[in-house]
Amino acid sequence: MTTEKIDNISVTTQANVYFDGKCISHGITLADGTKKSVGVILPASLTFNTGAAEIMECVAGACEYKLAGSDEWVQSSAGESFSVPGNSKFDIRVAAGFEAYHYICHFA
């Protein structure tokens, strides 16, 4: 199921801009103190490092991802999510000519 709306949040107004603008996100904090980020990845192939474990929820568009230690690219599209271990990394790619990948990153 795709998250369409998050109520009762505080938003960091200045965007986090990564990879020369290919990934842009905003941090949010829920009423209970839970932190997440919401963002978009434009067509590109990128590598992210994780501190805490993450769940990447796709709310629109699609991507392919590859977890550290794997050779397999897996597709993820709206309504789907994938988990990334903490202290790891993952590759993500959004194909040129396709809609940007819109996501919510849930930190564990």
From Swiss-Prot:
Query: E.C. number, please?
Result: 2.4.2.1, 2.4.2.2
Q: What is this protein identified as?
A: Pyrimidine/purine nucleoside phosphorylase
Q: What are the coiled-coil residue ranges?
A: none
- Give the catalytic activity: a purine D-ribonucleoside + phosphate = a purine nucleobase + alpha-D-ribose 1-phosphate; adenosine + phosphate = alpha-D-ribose 1-phosphate + adenine; cytidine + phosphate = cytosine + alpha-D-ribose 1-phosphate; guanosine + phosphate = alpha-D-ribose 1-phosphate + guanine
Report the gene name. ppnP
> tRNA-binding among the record's keywords?
no
The family annotation for this protein states: Belongs to the nucleoside phosphorylase PpnP family.
Give the UniProt entry's GO cellular component terms. cytosol
In terms of Pfam families, this protein maps to:
Ppnp
Which spans are transmembrane here?
none
Q: What are the alphabetically sorted keywords of the record? A: Glycosyltransferase, Transferase
Which InterPro entries does the record associate with it?
Answer: Ppnp, RmlC-like_jellyroll, RmlC_Cupin_sf
Gene3D superfamilies referenced in this protein's UniProt entry, alphabetically: Jelly Rolls
In its UniProt record, a GO molecular function of this protein is: thymidine phosphorylase activity
